[in-house]
Amino acid sequence: MSFFCVKHLSAGYSRKMILQNVSFSLEPGAVTGILGANGSGKTTLLKAICGILPHEGLCLLDDTKLEALPPRELAKRVSYIPQRSGISIDISALDVVLMGFNPRLKLLEHPTKAMIAAAGEALSRVGMADKAHTNYLHLSEGQKQLCILARTIVSGSRLLLLDEPESALDFQHRYRMLEMIRSWTEQMSGGAVITLHDPVLALNYCDRLMLLENGEILDILSPKEDPIEKMEQALSRIYGPVSLQLCKTRSGKEVLTMLKEDEP
């Protein structure tokens, strides 16, 4: 049964519509990846869902209309991680994580000892325990992304929206972040919608893949269930001719790889 549903969503900037009549649903514990060329509407979709961008249509979370929620209540339910955090003040990494509790604190109320401990544990989970008291502005872009993920972990939100979270991360941390997101969705019985630049990551870590082109859904794939031929045909509409190969790691885990084929 779906716990998050988008119905007939259209959005754009000024008078230019970017998204046209987008509808999809998300099951508890699932991760949906969004793939598409630049300008296809991936970021616009996330901004519309989290209320940053005005839109037509409905976004329902546990049958609650997100458009009707005050910003504070919306922030309790939905966490959005953009490509760049926008934080430009001198503040420690730990204090950034503590921002995840802000929607649950009253005006002028300070985080409790339990909240501070939880923030420290979240930093440890993302491999940033030794950076707790480091100035956030002095962190690398990848470390900043991990710090923001830790903030999301403590927020208690059930829906996570991420805009190309792997773009600033090295090879090792890309996989670590996706594994943590999967773990988070399962533990919270929540869900994640992620725009991704790397289709191989998407194929191996997402339960479903939404392919966008010019603001419309081309196809929705299930990498663990769909035939390779079907996925190749769909992905080729975005990336040009591609082939998918099912490989095994040394530990025996099956993974999908994608290769670019020559143009006919």
Residue ranges and their predicted role:
Residues 35-37:
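The feature captures the beta-strand-to-loop junction immediately N-terminal to the Walker
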